Amino acid sequence: MTAAPMFPAPMPRVGIAAVDHYLDRGFDSVVGMSSHFAAAVCCNLLKIQTELGVKGPIAEIGTFEGRFFIAMAHALQPGEKALGIDLFDWPNPAVIDRFEANCAKHGIAAERRITWKTDSRTMKPEDVLAKLDGRAPRLFHIDGEHSRHALSRDLERATAVMPPDGLIVLDDMLHPGYPTLMVAVQAHLEKHPEIVPLCIIDRQTIVGATKFVLCHRDWFKRYEERMLKVFKDNIWPLGADFEPHWCLVLSLDTRLADIT
């Protein structure tokens, strides 16, 4: 008889001291909505990239006060920078000061980050590359305006600057408050068959919602092979069926329904 999986499954560790320290002791003190679980997964993905020889900066649309941004920045290698893109006007203009203060408090020095106060609706792919000195971001986290049109636009920009070994992470997928976002993702995948879902990061709470991770089809197996080992305790057995593409589901709840 097969033993039932542990519930909840263990929170993944990253194995990068600065990342694990921040996730354990600083993450929850920074105002934001992304989950500890999603941050641990994405920082592990950055570590996997490094092990595979993937180099470069990262970018994020919707940086807010920096909760997720700081975690990812700690997973970068020396000389790699993190670009934070936001209007920085909600809930008040002082949010940019709180972002800068949070970065400084939690160890992301000014020379390791780029703060870009701009409207992603007017941003062009070449503008992103110019901010990064011509280097394509190896991971692009999209947590901007939660409308179908805005996500479609942000996805096109991220895809335009995505290197062959790059990753795109999408926030608040399958969220009951934003049901049409999935429509934008499906349309984008149909338009860009070279891009496929790499994994689904299950929600930790309704606030710490589900994320999708996308990659180039040619890199899917290379990433998946590493992920099967790194996330062995967090793999939901049935996976996700994107018809016909299949990908991993990572979760803190890997149980199946008991129907016996």
Predicted features and spans:
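A short alpha-helical cap/connector motif
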Residues: 1-141, 145-169, 173-260
